[in-house]
Amino acid sequence: MANGTNASAPYYSYEYYLDYLDLIPVDEKKLKAHKHSIVIAFWVSLAAFVVLLFLILLYMSWSASPQMRNSPKHHQTCPWSHGLNLHLCIQKCLPCHREPLATSQAQASSVEPGSRTGPDQPLRQESSSTLPLGGFQTHPTLLWELTLNGGPLVRSKPSEPPPGDRTSQLQS
């Protein structure tokens, strides 16, 4: 019992403590304009939390161990995931495909202006022998990787349609 005088008698009075009192009077009319702000803040923070969890899971799925990435059993299913490490790929690819400045200038000065051979022509000849004609490599690559490696260039109109393409039959 609250007062402890008679433990057998029921206690019907109520005691008000300082914890239950509103020390600062709040006017409801002032809160009416902001009554949905708590709900909006809750849903925005919940959405931000879900997006953060999604990004963490996505990063964890990309960061596999180096042994797993280099193993022949590991095939990458998403060819667009290369594009997210674009600056790293460019830094890796550019030094191995560029010649020193002095040798490329010497080759460029010895070539006729109208000819198609240039400092990048040997790279195209070497890489065209490694790539199958009209096909992709065993691992999917992006178009910018193919052009950096000297692969096939993208043309606006192909010489012949891909197999199974019926658009040319519909036009005639």
Swiss-Prot record:
Keyword annotations of the record: Cell membrane, Endoplasmic reticulum, Membrane, Transmembrane, Transmembrane helix
Membrane topology category: Single-pass membrane protein
Subunit structure: Homodimer and heterodimer. Forms antiparallel homodimers and heterodimers with MRAP2. Interacts with MC1R, MC2R, MC3R, MC4R and MC5R.
InterPro entries (UniProt xref): MRAP
Residue stretches spanning the membrane: 38-58
A UniProt-annotated Pfam family: MRAP
Name the record gives this protein: Melanocortin-2 receptor accessory protein
Recorded family membership: Belongs to the MRAP family.
Region (Disordered): 105-136, 151-172
Lineage: Eukaryota, Metazoa, Chordata, Craniata, Vertebrata
Organism: Homo sapiens
Subcellular location: Cell membrane; Endoplasmic reticulum membrane
Gene from which this protein is expressed: MRAP
Gene Ontology annotations of biological process type: negative regulation of adenylate cyclase-activating G protein-coupled receptor signaling pathway; negative regulation of protein localization to plasma membrane; positive regulation of adenylate cyclase-activating G protein-coupled receptor signaling pathway; protein localization to plasma membrane; regulation of adenylate cyclase-activating G protein-coupled receptor signaling pathway
Expressing tissues: Expressed in adrenal cortex, testis, breast, thyroid, lymph node, ovary and fat. Expressed in adipose tissues.
GO CC terms, sorted: endoplasmic reticulum; endoplasmic reticulum membrane; intracellular membrane-bounded organelle; plasma membrane
Function noted in UniProt: Modulator of melanocortin receptors (MC1R, MC2R, MC3R, MC4R and MC5R). Acts by increasing ligand-sensitivity of melanocortin receptors and enhancing generation of cAMP by the receptors. Required both for MC2R trafficking to the cell surface of adrenal cells and for signaling in response to corticotropin (ACTH). May be involved in the intracellular trafficking pathways in adipocyte cells.
Main location: membrane
Disease listed for this protein: Glucocorticoid deficiency 2: A form of glucocorticoid deficiency, a rare autosomal recessive disorder characterized by resistance to ACTH action on the adrenal cortex, adrenal insufficiency and an inability of the adrenal cortex to produce cortisol. It usually presents in the neonatal period or in early childhood with episodes of hypoglycemia and other symptoms related to cortisol deficiency, including failure to thrive, recurrent illnesses or infections, convulsions, and shock.
GO MF assignments: corticotropin hormone receptor binding; identical protein binding; signaling receptor regulator activity; type 1 melanocortin receptor binding; type 3 melanocortin receptor binding; type 4 melanocortin receptor binding; type 5 melanocortin receptor binding
